[in-house]
Amino acid sequence: TPPFYTSVDIRNAGFKLAPVDTNLFPAGWNNLSEPMLPLAVQAAMAAIEKVCPEARNLLIIPENTLRTDLSYLHNVAQLERIFRMAGLNVRIGSIDPDLREATRFTLHNEHTLLVEPVLRTERRLVLRDFDPCTILLNNDLSSGMPGILEDLHEQNLLPPLHAGWNVRHK
C-alpha cells in the first residue's frame, strides 16, 4: 500500500540530489508557500477519494506535544486548512490522556486551533457530535501504540497503525 502522505528530506551536494530520510507522519505543512497550497488541496482531494470516496468527516490525530510546541500547532492548523479546502469537515482530536476537555490554542497569526479529546465507542473513534469516516494520524506513535486506536474496523485509519514508530525501526 503506498503511503497516504509523506515527506522526504533531500541532501543537495551541489551536483546531485539524494533522499536521506522519509517520514510517513510529516510535520512542516506550515512551510508550504501560498502558491503551493492549491496543489496540496488537489492532492488531498485525490488521496481521500482513493481511500474513501464518500468521505465527509475527517478527524486529525496530532502528536501529544501540542501544549509545548507552537511550531507543530501551526503544522496541524495548515493540515486542517488543506483538508477543509478539499471540502471535508475537519476536526482535531487528541489521544493525549492529559487533554480532558476541548482546548483552544492561539497561534502567532491570531488564528486559533481547537483540539478536543477523542472518545472511543465500541468500534469507533469519535468526538462529541462528530463521527468521522476517516482518521488521519499525524502522530508517529513513537511512545507506543495506544489501545484507543486498536480495532477500528469501521473507519479508515491513515497511515495504518503498522506504519508507526512503535513497529518500524530505522
Language-model segments: residues:
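ATP-dependent carboxylate activation and anion-phosphoryl transfer catalytic cores
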Residues: 1-108, 133
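Conserved N-proximal alpha/beta basic substrate-recognition cap immediately N-terminal to
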Residues: 66-170
